[in-house]
Amino acid sequence: MGKLGFGQLWALIAETLAPGKGIPLHAHENMEIISIPLSGTLRHRDSRGATHIIAPGDIHVLSAGLGVTHWEYNDSPNEPAHYLQAWIRPKSRMTPTRYAQGTMDDCDGSFCLIAAPGGCDSVVEIDQDAFVSLARLPRGTEMQYSKYGDANGLHVFVIDGRLDIGRKELADGTGLSLIGQESPVLKVLAPSRVLCIEVPL
């Protein structure tokens, strides 16, 4: 899992950092980078001195417009850190770099919106007409994902678990990109955490 090139979703990355280890200094520009920690504690530190620490239940957005150089590393000396990052192209280029961080709502049994244009309360703002939702679904659930925009593409990613979408089975760490106006029906075959990323094509 890495570069997708699916509409405005440039990449979806799963990363595991060993205790005390990290990703060396690197640069980003003109990208909305959404970090979703799954276990452990992740620390971001940039060349301007800004530091952010995130843990499961948090969501963090780096809007790297004009550009920023930063490090990411596991803040724990004894626990691995596992997280997802979605990279989405922004609507506007070369805007001032900014950060946003929030705490997600309880996503048990249904999808909760965690990142969207405008943002509000527990939804962090991103500079794109894209919508990122997360759910924890019990086995036997059958539900329809309701799209925010008919013309948008939808990428469904199973963090862990197993589900069926239109007779296509997805399991741990696999995803499916969907194009079309229909909102898909998800049939949950095992307890699952599911990430849905809806983006303009």
What are these regions (language model features)?
Residues M1-A27, M31-E32, Y83, M104-S146:
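A short glycine-rich, His/Asp/Glu-containing loop-to-beta-strand
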Residues R48-S63, D106-G109, I165-V188:
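Short acidic-glycine-tyrosine-enriched beta hairpin
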